[in-house]
Amino acid sequence: MSEDLPSDVVAVITQLCEKTRQALSEGDCETARAAVDTIERVATNKLPEGEHRQTVRHACERIAAVLADDETDDALAYVEALERRFPAAP
């Protein structure tokens, strides 16, 4: 995506995605849900309006929905897709 993203926000979201992945791999859906809620809040409050914010928020909604159905494999796939939306850390 061509939007300039604040590096501190990208770092926070990336860390939260890692936390979500780890929680899912350990079967800790509660921690995963909390991390996804935080990602959505960070995106809403800190990312500039535009396609990237909308994409992140949509991904968070989908992750929350599949977690509500205890579909951890699907949630993990969404988290990994979300991580690919961010540039690699320098």
Task: Locate predicted features.
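Acidic, polar-rich N-terminal leader regions of halophilic archaeal proteins
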Residues: M1-P90
